[in-house]
Each structure stands twice: as C-alpha cells, then as structure tokens.
C-alpha cells in the first residue's frame, strides 16, 4: 500500500500544482485530487496536501514536496 497524497483543486490553483506534478512521477505514491478537502483556512495560508490524512504544508512547491517526503519517512505506514 502506497502513501496517499491528496490535493485540493483550489490549492492546486494557488500554486501546489507544481508539487503535484513532481509527486505524480513517483510510482510509490498515490496522488489524488479533490474539489475541496475542507481545510479552507489552511488552503488560504499556504500550499498543502493531506498525506495519509495528515496536513503537510510548505511555502513553495519545492518545500511542500520536501516536507511530504520528510513526513512519509518519519511516519511509516507499517
């Protein structure tokens, strides 16, 4: 079972699309997009994604990708 990375379409429009494009190239991740993840305050503040149900944020797409991989390393699923 791969880690699940979920993006909000509104946050993609705010800049996290670049992070999504990078993460989608990793065959060890399941990357999904939803209309809304109901994290509107977080969405307005910074780029974010849900990683296995937990919020991970970054100020830039590169930082978001780095933070997602760090989160996955520090929180193994098994």
From Swiss-Prot:
InterPro entries: DUF1450, UPF0349. It comes from the Bacteria. It holds the Pfam family DUF1450. HAMAP family: UPF0349. Belongs to the UPF0349 family. This is UPF0349 protein YuzB. It comes from Bacillus subtilis (strain 168). The lineage of its organism: Bacteria, Bacillati, Bacillota, Bacilli, Bacillales. The gene is yuzB.
């Amino acid at each position: 079972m791969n880690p699940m990375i979920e993006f909000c379409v509104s946050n993609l429009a705010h800049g996290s699309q670049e992070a999504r494009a990078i993460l989608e190239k990793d065959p060890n991740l399941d990357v999904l997009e939803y209309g809304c993840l109901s994290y509107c305050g977080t969405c307005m503040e910074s780029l974010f994604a849900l990683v296995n149900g937990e919020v991970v944020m970054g100020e830039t797409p590169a930082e978001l990708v780095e933070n997602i991989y760090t989160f996955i390393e520090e929180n193994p699923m098994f």
